[in-house]
């Protein structure tokens, strides 16, 4: 009987320790179609979150990790994305009118039908971003600078010649 109690207590302690030690990974957040106008997401890890068709007008996403995020059809007019990491993000049909993308990393993002009128892209890295030819021309007309993280020249990442 004593051996049974000792074994049971040890088992309970191990189960409790395993439960306390287990840290579940964060699940991606769903912000689809939400009105997030002016919301401050600066410096946050938003990896794989979804902002499909969300209103992010004048929101602050500066220095945020947005890797793999869906911004499909989102309105980012006037948003601050300075220093944001948008690697492999879905940007198709997103509106970046007058957005600040200074030093942002957009490597591998899909943005074929994204719009960038009046966007500030100084130092932004567009390596392997799929864009429409007319969007590429528009961005090349204002492209300048070098991304401080990747060391890549904005004009070179856009193939501006």
Task: Name each region found by the language model.
Residues 2-8, 14-161:
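Tandem repeat scaffolds
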